């Protein structure tokens, strides 16, 4: 087992993916806000077409919100695996080393939560805006 490769995977792979997911969710949230601000819902003759336009890219934000926690958990599990492997290889149980390694392993879960919580807030905010836009269209077209 190549421990150095696993450490790099956790540090750059898992954490890099989580940071990227955070930027993607923020980008699509801002993009949707600009789209909703400039949208004239009355220019749509069919409600389904309006709904398709309104919900575009929201599933990406929802997927990021739900999956970033699991990606963070994967990083933590890999970090704990590395800690136990290194303990087994050295044959020594040093509490300082174990606690430091476990603390670094938990950073992946923490980052996963840091990405997931705002993404879920973004998604819920957009869903509310979608409901309002659809209701306004319904009021004007019924």
For the regions a protein language model found, what residue spans apply to each?
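ABC transporter TMD-NBD coupling linker
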Residues: 132-142
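Hydrophobic alpha-helical transmembrane segments of small proteolipidic membrane proteins, enriched
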Residues: 1-134
């Amino acid at each position: 087992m190549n421990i150095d490769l696993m450490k790099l995977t956790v540090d750059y792979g898992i954490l890099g993916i989580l940071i990227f997911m955070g930027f993607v969710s923020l980008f699509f949230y801002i993009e949707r806000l600009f789209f909703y601000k400039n949208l004239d819902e009355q220019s749509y003759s069919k409600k389904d077409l309006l709904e398709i336009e309104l919900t575009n890219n929201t599933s990406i934000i929802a997927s990021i919100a739900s999956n970033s926690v699991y990606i963070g958990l994967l990083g933590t599990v890999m970090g704990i695996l590395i800690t136990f492997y290194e303990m087994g290889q050295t044959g020594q149980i040093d509490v300082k080393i174990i606690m430091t390694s476990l603390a670094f392993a938990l950073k992946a879960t923490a980052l996963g939560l840091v990405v997931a919580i705002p993404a879920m807030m973004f998604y819920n905010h957009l869903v509310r805006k979608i409901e309002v836009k659809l209701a306004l269209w319904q009021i004007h077209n019924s």
